[in-house]
Every structure is written in structure tokens, then in C-alpha cells.
Amino acid sequence: MKQLLDFLPLVIFFAVYKFFDIYIASGALIVATALQLVVTYLLYKKIEKMHLITFAMVSFFGTLTLVFHDDAFIKWKVTVVYALFALALALSQYLKKPILKGMLGKELIVADKIWSRVTWYWVTFFLACGLVNIYVAFNLSQETWVNFKVFGLTALTLINTVITVVYLYKHMPEEHKKELK
């Protein structure tokens, strides 16, 4: 259910874009992201920082898109969010409080050097996605960008998640692997 809620604003953005335009879709994205926060809180009595940051960025860039009637703002939102995620991961690693280990370290027991590699892998991934987003957003058609944002970046993130889980599992001690089975 929680994963479905995570994708709901993206699905709404895509559907509204297909039936209307980027501006109505941007407004729908703001509303859908706000509703996502409300529903998440009602169901789980908690809102993750990532959702708050995403809502802030969607609201800020979406509002600029609507006020100035310029789709460049909503296109930049994707890159800014990825850059913030990369920065947060890099800072957490630098401060010796890795976010990924904090999120998954209880279930996936691996050495700190493995968490460090995974963290830098995701930093690189987020930065690369942000750069590719800039290229697609400003060199290809708006429709291509929307499809890339919805399907391309989502697929890349899912593939990256699978690669990360396989890598972490490979480096887990055997006794912990047995507990997961």
C-alpha cells in the first residue's frame, strides 16, 4: 500500500498530462502530493522526510511553473530533487551517519565499507539521473521528457534498487542470509 501511495502523484501527473497539458498536470501534481502526505499520515501516523522534501519541491517548482507559465521550472524540479538526495547521502556518509544503513541496516547486516560503497553508488546514480534529466528536458520534446520522467527514471530507480539488494545480499554473512529465507 505504501509503495502504491509513493507512485500515485506520478501516475496522476502522467494521466492529467495526457488528457490536458503540462500546466494542469503540474497543478494536479501539487494537489496529489499534498493528498499523499495526508493519506500517509492518516494511515501510518508518520510522514517521512523524503516525502516532505518532495512535497516542498513539487509545491515550489510547480507553483513557479503555473505562475510564470513556463514548464522549465517543473523540469528542473526533478534534477533539484535528485541533487538534494545525492547531497543528503554524501553528507550522511561524510558525517559517518549513513542514511541507507540507518534505513536498512537492521534487516541487512553488512560491513560498513559495503554501506559506504552502496551510498556512493546511489550518490552517483542520483547525480547521473539529474544530469540526464536536464539533457532530456531541454533537448527533446516535452512529451518525451514526461515519458522519460514517468517511465525511464522509475525503471532506472527500480533496476538500481534490485542491483543494490543483490549486492548487499552477496555481502551478508551466511547466518543472516538464512534468517531472511
Curated annotation (Swiss-Prot):
Record keywords: Cell inner membrane, Cell membrane, Membrane, Transmembrane, Transmembrane helix
Name of the protein in question: Inner membrane-spanning protein YciB
Pfam families the record matches: IspA
Family, similarity comment: Belongs to the YciB family.
Transmembrane feature ranges: 11-31, 50-70, 72-92, 118-138, 148-168
Entry membrane topology: Multi-pass membrane protein
Domain of life from the UniProt record: Bacteria
InterPro entries: YciB (IPR006008)
Keyword Cell inner membrane assigned: yes
Family annotation (NCBIfam families): ispZ, PRK00259.1-2, PRK00259.1-3
